[in-house]
Each structure stands twice: as C-alpha cells, then as structure tokens.
Amino acid sequence: MINVEIIKNYDKWREHKQINKSLIKKITQNVLLRFDNFSKIKQFELSILLTNTAEILTLNKQFRNIEKATNVLSFPSNELNWQDLYSKLEFLGDSDYIHLGDIAFCYEVIYNESCEQQKNFENHFIHLLIHSILHLIGFDHQNDTEANIMENLEIEILSYFGISSPY
C-alpha cells in the first residue's frame, strides 16, 4: 500500500486534475516494483508539495544553499543507495513501513520547461516524479555512469506509461 499526501499551495495546479493521488500512487508503485527488495514492504508513504516559484526558491536556498528556482526538489527520508536495492533486504532491516520522503514541484518552472521543450505538461511532470522517486530510493546522477543508469530506468518507466524518452 502506498499512502500519498498532497499539499497544493498554488492554484494553477488545480487546473491539472489528472495530477492526483491516484496517478502518483500508480507511478510510485511502478518504480518500486522494479526492485524485488521493496516487495516485502507492506506500506510506503510519500509527501508531495505542489507549489510555486517563491516557495521552491525558499526551499532551494534553505536546504541546498542555492538561490534559484528549480523544477523539483527531493528530500529522502532514508539514506538508501541504489546499489543496495539489488542486494538482500538488510539495508531496510525488518521494516514493513517506509516513508520514502518528500518531493516539492514548482509549477512555473515545470510549465516553462514544458513550453520551451514542447512537452506535454503532465508528461513532463510524470518524468520529474519518476526522477524524484528514484532519488528518494538512492539513485543519483553525479557521474556519467550513474546518470546513464538513472536515465535508462526513467525511459523504461515512461515507456510503460506510453510516454516517449525526454532525452
């Protein structure tokens, strides 16, 4: 079971009814089921903030010391490493519950990127959601090898939902 809490702090998000708990649960489940280790976990929790430039700017400055708006910020609750996902369940202990973390999305940045890159807004959001969930479970893109692994997973998951590669 995946519990999703969504906070919409910006009215423009309400125009995108298809971005809802059901979609976020479906995407999250698709990502997690790719890793056998997560199949033993009974309950996952994820918090989503749908906000605007002012708030994402504040969060980015506060947590990353970067004074710039960004499309999405991921705040993992666990110190997971993607390589551990392929090993035994020891990295999770005996837990049957995991709070994956928090993700904050900025409407204006995502909207502008969608327009500039000629992408459907919802599809771009889904890509960013997948990308963020991968960050929450320990994936990163600090070097080319990590970036390739992460991008290939994103492309595979997007393809499952009928969305073409953003790369």
UniProtKB/Swiss-Prot annotation:
SUPFAM superfamilies: Metalloproteases ('zincins'), catalytic domain. Zn(2+) binds at residues 131, 135, 141. Its main location: cytoplasm. It comes from the Bacteria. Binds 1 zinc ion. Keywords: Cytoplasm, Endonuclease, Hydrolase, Metal-binding, Nuclease, Ribosome biogenesis, rRNA processing, Zinc. GO terms for cellular component: cytoplasm. It is an enzyme of class 3 (hydrolase). Its EC number is 3.1.-.-. It is found in: Cytoplasm. GO terms for biological process: rRNA processing. Single strand-specific metallo-endoribonuclease involved in late-stage 70S ribosome quality control and in maturation of the 3' terminus of the 16S rRNA. Belongs to the endoribonuclease YbeY family. PANTHER family: ENDORIBONUCLEASE YBEY, CHLOROPLASTIC. HAMAP family: Endoribonucl_YbeY. This is Endoribonuclease YbeY. It comes from Rickettsia felis (strain ATCC VR-1525 / URRWXCal2).
